[in-house]
From Swiss-Prot:
Name of the protein: Large ribosomal subunit protein uL30
Pfam families: Ribosomal_L30 (PF00327)
PANTHER family: LARGE RIBOSOMAL SUBUNIT PROTEIN UL30M (PTHR15892:SF2), MITOCHONDRIAL RIBOSOMAL PROTEIN L30 (PTHR15892)
GO cellular component, one term: cytosolic large ribosomal subunit
Alphabetical GO biological process terms: translation
Organism: Chlorobaculum tepidum (strain ATCC 49652 / DSM 12025 / NBRC 103806 / TLS) (Chlorobium tepidum)
Encoding gene, per UniProt annotation: rpmD
Annotated keywords: Ribonucleoprotein, Ribosomal protein
Family stated for the protein in its record: Belongs to the universal ribosomal protein uL30 family.
One function term, GO molecular function aspect: structural constituent of ribosome
Amino acid sequence: MSEKMIKVTQVRSVIGGTKKQKDTIKALGLGRPNHKVEIKDNACTRGQIRVVQHLVKVEEL
């Protein structure tokens, strides 16, 4: 059984953000606006997304 996946798109820049927000964006595999990644949907990932929810858009696949 395959795990659920989500597509995360960075919609805003991290300029002016805190170090925690910048590190979280990098950990998610993002780095610039309009960059997209597909990652596994689990509690760890959801926690990271919550930290930068104002910078990203999340879509269920």
